[in-house]
């Protein structure tokens, strides 16, 4: 019980650092203090939504999302969005992917494919599945998992953005 609070604080610091990394242009509020929860489209999960503000106006949103479709099981990401729903970036905050293979989902060469796109199901798949995303070599399952998590976040963002 003595270690629970420091572990929680370390996790929050890691999440806030990830939010800062995926929100283009920064923010002047504390997105962690303003966080809210939003249900996934199927209603089975609650995602954490961090609004980023500049001069009191929402300038972007970061969403903590997850998937159980990783090669190593559960994977958690923070995904950033511009107000038009375009992905600004993502950061993996937890995964059990294979070192040197699945962990390449965190490398710029793979991540850069997502920046500036608005996910649409018909193209938001790895090329092996008829989409436009180059999977990490020998880590197609991990690549698909990232897409699944980002798609969940995107669907939640679209639900949230109707209220902006």
Predicted feature residues:
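Flexible, solvent-exposed loop/hinge segments and secondary-structure transition points
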Residues: 1-164
């Amino acid at each position: 019980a003595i270690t629970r609070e420091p572990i929680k604080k370390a996790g929050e610091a890691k999440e806030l650092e990830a939010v800062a990394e995926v929100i283009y242009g920064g923010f002047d509020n504390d997105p962690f203090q303003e966080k809210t929860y939003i249900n996934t489209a199927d209603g089975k999960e609650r995602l954490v939504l961090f609004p980023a503000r500049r001069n009191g106006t929402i300038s972007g949103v970061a969403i903590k999302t997850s998937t159980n479709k990783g090669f190593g099981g559960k994977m958690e990401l923070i995904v950033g969005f511009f107000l038009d729903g375009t992905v600004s970036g993502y950061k993996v905050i937890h995964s059990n992917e294979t070192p040197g293979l699945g962990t390449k989902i965190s490398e710029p060469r793979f991540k850069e494919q997502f920046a500036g796109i608005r996910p649409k199901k018909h193209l938001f798949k790895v090329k092996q599945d008829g989409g436009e995303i180059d999977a990490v070599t020998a880590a197609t399952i991990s690549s698909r998992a990232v897409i699944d998590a980002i798609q969940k976040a995107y669907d939640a963002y679209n639900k949230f953005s109707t209220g902006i």
